[in-house]
Structures are given as C-alpha cells and as structure tokens.
C-alpha cells in the first residue's frame, strides 16, 4: 500500500474515533501514513477493545495520540487545542473528522412511549451540527489546519435498542 502521507507531519483529528466510522477512518488513514489524534468518550467496559484497536493504529508506524474527553464541552476543546499545539510541533491537521453522535431514539408519535420533544432535537443539532462548526473554528483560529485541509462529518440515523 502506498503511504502517501508518510513523513509529511500531517495529522487527522478524529472526534469520535473509538468505534464505528471514526475508528474505521483512523485505521485507513494510518495505513496511508497519516498521524492520528483520536478524541473519544468511552466507558471502562470498552477499554480493552479500544486499546487493541488503538494498538493496530500504532502498528502502522504513525504518531498516535488519544484523548478521553467530552468533545462537546468548550473548555475541554480549548484544553485539547492547546495540547495539540505542543503535540503536533510543526505538524498540521490535514483532515478533521467529526464522527460524534448524541441524540435519542424516541419515536415521533406513539401512544405507549415517550415521544421526541423540541429539546431532543436541540440536543442533536448542538451535538452533530454546531459542535462541528465550533471545532472547525477553534482549529482554524489556532492555525493548526494545513493549507489544503479537509473537513468530514458523519451523521447517524441512530441504532436500535
């Protein structure tokens, strides 16, 4: 496989990278030589699997850092950006992947269970829309993006219980 990002000091900042599309993106980009920074929020019960997954990324001979934090908290975002300035040294973020999901699976109509309310939609819009804007703005203002950076955002229609 061609490692077109190898030795270029380019990074992927992946928000929500401990599972699903975020993790798959991290693995694929690492295979192509891109350094990886994953922001995640997981429980201890998922820690062993996550460590195995993260180990696979480091086996691609790329730089790797991870932060277990709430990506939706402005003060945590600010702390992470300051940490990245040091961690990346003179490297830049080539791609920001927003793969965090927060919402609920309530139905719109039902006679037997609680249905969606306005605050449910506001929570989802904040987490999956405004959060993307806030992260892009913060990374841009910190001058951490490369000149030809990309932003990728995944959304979800949810899972079933």
Which stretches of residues belong to each language-model region?
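The beta1-alpha1 cofactor-binding region of Rossmann-like NAD(H)/NADP(H)-dependent oxidoreductases
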Residues: 45, 68-83
């Amino acid at each position: 496989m061609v490692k077109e990002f190898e030795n270029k000091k380019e990074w992927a900042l992946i928000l929500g990278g401990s599972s699903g599309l975020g993790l798959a993106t991290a693995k694929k980009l690492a295979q192509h030589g891109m350094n990886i920074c994953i922001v995640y929020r997981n429980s201890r019960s998922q820690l062993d699997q996550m460590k195995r997954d993260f180990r696979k990324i480091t086996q691609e001979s790329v730089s790797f850092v991870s932060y277990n934090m709430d990506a939706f908290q402005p003060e945590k975002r600010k702390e992470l950006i300051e940490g990245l300035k040091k961690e990346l040294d003179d490297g830049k973020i080539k791609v920001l992947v927003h793969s965090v999901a927060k919402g609920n699976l309530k139905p719109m109509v039902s006679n037997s269970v609680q249905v969606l309310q306005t605050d449910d939609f506001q929570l989802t819009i904040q987490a999956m829309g405004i959060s993307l804007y806030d992260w892009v703005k913060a990374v841009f203002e910190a001058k951490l993006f490369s000149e030809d950076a990309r932003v990728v955002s995944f959304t979800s229609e949810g899972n079933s219980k």
